[in-house]
């Protein structure tokens, strides 16, 4: 699959914005964009984000190595200052590297395809994100994080085992 990116925070002026990038080969750009060689995964790193040696912003960066990531792929997150200008420059940078803008639900779709989550969890996550009341949070959260998800996973495992035998 291609390398995709998305703004994970609203596209409005704020203190910070977060971009998520995922896909095979995305880590190949870390040295070029951030000036880091072989950074450790799962550590928050402070570094300069550049486009062709032109400084854009001092950002936070976290790398995730697949399959130990949400999508199951190599990925990284960029924590930048939340000005609209910075967001625009980051979008331009990612576009110039050939990254594709992720469609809505793309990261969850990749997590499902890579067996990181099941269908119930994918649907429950959507409900959880869309929840507008505390009742909706509790109901969708129970489905996503609670007993229902575990019971469905156990049931699915039993079906798979019975099909094998």
Specify the residue positions occupied by each region the protein language model found:
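A glycine-rich (often HGG/GG-containing) alpha/beta subdomain
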Residues: 1-138, 142, 146
């Amino acid at each position: 699959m291609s390398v995709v990116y998305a703004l994970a925070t609203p596209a409005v002026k704020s203190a910070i914005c977060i971009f998520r990038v995922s896909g095979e080969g995305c880590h190949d750009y870390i040295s070029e964009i951030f000036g880091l060689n072989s950074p450790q995964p799962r550590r928050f790193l402070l570094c300069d984000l550049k486009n062709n040696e032109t400084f854009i912003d001092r950002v936070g960066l976290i790398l995730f190595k697949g399959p130990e990531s949400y999508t199951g792929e190599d990925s990284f997150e960029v924590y930048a200052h939340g000005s609209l200008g910075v967001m625009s420059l980051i979008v331009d940078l990612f576009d110039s590297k050939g990254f594709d803008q992720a469609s809505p639900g793309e990261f969850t779709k990749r997590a499902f395809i890579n067996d990181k989550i099941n269908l119930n969890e994918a649907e429950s996550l959507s409900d959880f994100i869309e929840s507008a009341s505390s009742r909706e949070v509790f109901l969708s959260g129970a489905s996503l994080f609670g007993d229902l998800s575990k019971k469905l996973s156990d049931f699915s495992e039993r079906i798979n085992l019975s099909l094998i035998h």
